[in-house]
């Protein structure tokens, strides 16, 4: 179910304050966050946000196309290593 329009998009307060401070000083540095649930706002464009995937922080450079999506969409948590191969040919 989608979020109610009357509530508006969600972003963690600590993340928003960090980005606003960087925008005031015109600095571009990596911001570490564990908040995968935060929505990407237009203020984030041009910044690199390191999103935690459960093991490490994945650097995500924010572009215009990402606005409105969640940070967690760009840091996958699971690695797919493929299905087990069919060893019938090697058993002969």
Swiss-Prot record:
Q: Which GO terms describe its biological process?
A: ribosomal small subunit assembly; translation
| A GO term, aspect molecular function | rRNA binding
Q: Which UniProt keywords apply?
A: Ribonucleoprotein, Ribosomal protein, RNA-binding, rRNA-binding
Q: Does the keyword Ribosomal protein apply?
A: yes
Which cellular component, as a GO term, is one annotated location? small ribosomal subunit
Q: Mention any Pfam family matching this sequence.
A: Ribosomal_S19
List, alphabetically, the PANTHER family matched: RIBOSOMAL PROTEIN S19P FAMILY MEMBER, SMALL RIBOSOMAL SUBUNIT PROTEIN US19M
Known partners and oligomeric status: Part of the 30S ribosomal subunit.
Q: What is this protein called?
A: Small ribosomal subunit protein uS19
Q: Give the organism, scientific name.
A: Bacillus subtilis (strain 168)
């Amino acid at each position: 179910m989608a979020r109610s329009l009357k509530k508006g998009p969600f972003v963690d307060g600590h993340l928003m304050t960090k980005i606003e401070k960087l925008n005031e000083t015109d600095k571009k540095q990596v911001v570490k966050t564990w908040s995968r649930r935060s929505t990407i706002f237009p203020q984030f464009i041009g910044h690199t946000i390191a999103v935690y995937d459960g093991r490490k922080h994945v650097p995500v450079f924010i572009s215009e196309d990402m606005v409105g999506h969640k940070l967690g969409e760009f840091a996958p948590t699971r690695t797919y290593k493929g299905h087990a191969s069919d060893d019938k040919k090697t058993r002969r």
